[in-house]
Swiss-Prot record:
Localization per Swiss-Prot or TrEMBL: Cytoplasm
Tagged with keyword Transcription regulation: no
Family: Belongs to the acyl carrier protein (ACP) family.
Origin organism lineage: Bacteria, Bacillati, Bacillota, Bacilli, Bacillales
Residues where O-(pantetheine 4'-phosphoryl)serine is found: 37
Record note on modification: 4'-phosphopantetheine is transferred from CoA to a specific serine of apo-ACP by AcpS. This modification is essential for activity because fatty acids are bound in thioester linkage to the sulfhydryl of the prosthetic group.
Gene Ontology MF terms: acyl binding; acyl carrier activity
Protein name (record): Acyl carrier protein
PROSITE patterns, alphabetized: CARRIER, PHOSPHOPANTETHEINE
PANTHER family for this protein: ACYL CARRIER PROTEIN (PTHR20863), CARRIER DOMAIN-CONTAINING PROTEIN (PTHR20863:SF76)
Keyword line: Cytoplasm, Fatty acid biosynthesis, Fatty acid metabolism, Lipid biosynthesis, Lipid metabolism, Phosphopantetheine, Phosphoprotein
């Protein structure tokens, strides 16, 4: 899980330009990290590429925090 979190953090830092220290498992993409809906869509696409998986639109709408995306990736490897 630590490796997954580190890879997710790197993508978030690259995409959103936020300080890595703000990225915690509890951090909300929109409220805590300042992402808008387009940012979230782009994050999902990058995560799909990075982890070689497909996140359905329905699932993507439910993923609102860093911890949720890490859990999703871990359970779909």
């Amino acid at each position: 899980m630590a490796d997954t979190l580190e890879r997710v953090k790197k993508i978030i830092v690259d995409r959103l330009g936020v300080d890595e220290s703000k990225i915690t498992l509890e951090a909300s993409f929109k409220e805590d990290l300042g992402a808008d809906s387009l940012d979230v869509v782009e994050l999902v696409m990058e995560l799909e590429d990075e982890f070689d998986l497909e996140i359905s639109d329905e699932d993507a709408e439910k993923i609102t925090s860093v911890g949720e995306v890490v859990k999703y990736i871990e359970s779909h490897k």
